[in-house]
């Protein structure tokens, strides 16, 4: 027996009884707008259901629990935190950067603080409240008389204070480092030059970076063609598994800047 979108919606409604669900057609698929206490979230439930596979098991049940928790905690964050009441010192202390795909929030109707990063990714600024975070819009910067770039500087400073944790795997002469501090900002460490340069000193010009979803960053020391094939397969796997997928495109780092690097696997 396989999962259905209705089954997952029921799980969410158990936690958010007054939730309203609106369906919107985009191309040949359906996107759902969830509305809870005047806050909204857009989700692609059908893509998530496909990731679960055709059989129910403990692993897929865990993925559903994580998915529901992610949605519920985000709505609770929208309700709890009023950015209109923030003071400048509090904002500076708790602001962090996160990275999203350029397809995320394309129209930016909420006027979120959004900065360019790469052809595949954009940077957003969020207010962290320990159990989650809330995206910041430009009302905050206008209200507190601070520029997007200045606030981004403080956000990067807070990111750099986080501990660096990672696992290392070696396969056929290639080394793979998986960042896993599990603090909600592992993917965002692609913005931390200190982290990138720490690994660059180890790796040098064979430095590849992967950002398949928000909760991981893959740094690879690639020595041969097989290493590239492994990296691409890992990227696709992680992208499919992530709650907030970002990109399957890999980046190369030269000690100064990131450049998109397309890996073609035969």
Which residues make up each language-model segment?
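Short, flexible beta-strand-to-coil junctions
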Residues: 26, 35-39, 129-130, 210-215, ...
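Short, non-transmembrane alpha-helical segments in secretory-pathway proteins
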Residues: 2-17
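Charged, alpha-helical interface segments at or near domain boundaries
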Residues: 11, 15, 25, 29-184
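Hydrophobic residues embedded in beta-strands of well-ordered beta-sheets
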Residues: 29-32, 216-217, 258
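C-terminal structured domains
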Residues: 222-266
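Helical (often loop-to-helix) elements that flank the catalytic cores of nucleotide-handling enzymes
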Residues: 42-49, 194, 200-201, 227-239
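Structural alpha-beta junctions
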Residues: 14-20, 161-163, 201-206, 239-246
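Intrinsically disordered, low-complexity segments enriched in Gly and acidic/Ser/Thr residues
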Residues: 176-230
């Amino acid at each position: 027996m396989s999962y259905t979108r209705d089954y997952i919606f029921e799980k969410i409604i158990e936690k958010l009884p007054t939730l309203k669900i609106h369906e919107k057609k985009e191309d040949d698929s359906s996107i759902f707008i969830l509305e809870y206490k005047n806050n909204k979230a857009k989700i692609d439930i059908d893509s998530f259901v496909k990731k679960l596979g055709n059989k129910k098991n403990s692993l897929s049940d865990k993925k559903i629990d994580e998915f529901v928790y992610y949605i519920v905690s985000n709505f609770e964050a929208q309700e709890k935190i009023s950015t209109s009441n923030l003071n400048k010192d509090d904002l500076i202390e708790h602001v962090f950067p996160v990275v999203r795909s350029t397809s995320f929030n394309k129209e930016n109707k909420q006027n979120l603080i959004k900065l360019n990063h790469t052809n595949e990714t954009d940077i957003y600024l969020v207010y962290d409240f320990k159990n989650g975070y809330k995206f910041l819009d430009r009302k905050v910067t206008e209200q507190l008389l601070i520029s997007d770039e200045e606030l981004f500087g403080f956000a990067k400073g807070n990111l750099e204070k986080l501990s660096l944790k990672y696992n290392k795997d070696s396969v056929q002469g290639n080394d793979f480092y998986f960042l896993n501090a599990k603090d909600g900002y592992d993917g965002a460490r692609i913005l931390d030059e200190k982290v990138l340069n720490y690994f660059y000193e180890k790796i040098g010009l064979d430095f590849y970076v992967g950002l398949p979803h928000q909760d991981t960053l893959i740094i690879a020391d690639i020595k041969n063609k097989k290493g590239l094939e492994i990296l691409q397969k890992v990227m696709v796997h992680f992208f499919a598994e992530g709650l907030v997928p970002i990109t399957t495109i890999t980046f190369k780092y030269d000690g100064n800047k990131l450049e998109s690097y397309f890996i073609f696997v035969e």
